[in-house]
Amino acid sequence: MKIFKFLFVIPVITLVIIFQTSFQNRYLMASDIRDGETIFRNVCAGSHVRGGSVVLKGSKSLKLSDLEKRGIADVNSIIIIANDGIGFMKGYKNKLKDGEDKVLAQWIIQNAEKGWE
């Protein structure tokens, strides 16, 4: 009976850890949503109002279809772009504090998935 419990508990714990990790990487908690929105307003909104593009003709939007077309519809790609920039957009690694790039990227992906409602 002890072996059965052991064989049952280990996979359950493993699944919980995997689920928590993927959930944390993809979705934000309430405080992070506020932080993500604040960071976006301070750093990105001047160029990407509601996920659109208002700077230069031909600039890219943050709408999900545009992110997918460019192969950057994931948190890690957005983190890299937020830090290093892309095209005409400069990077903000000197402006973003530790962890803010991830919170911002998660917030952008969540809003892109919701259609920037």
Name the predicted role of every residue range:
Residues K63-N76, G91-K102:
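Electron-transfer interface patches adjacent to heme c in soluble/periplasmic c-type cytochromes
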Residues K93-E117:
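C-terminal capping alpha-helices of c-type cytochrome domains
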Residues S31-L62, I80, D84-K90, Q110-E117:
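Periplasmic/extracellular electron-transfer cofactor-ligation site
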Residues M1-R34, K114-E117:
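N-terminal export/targeting leaders of redox proteins
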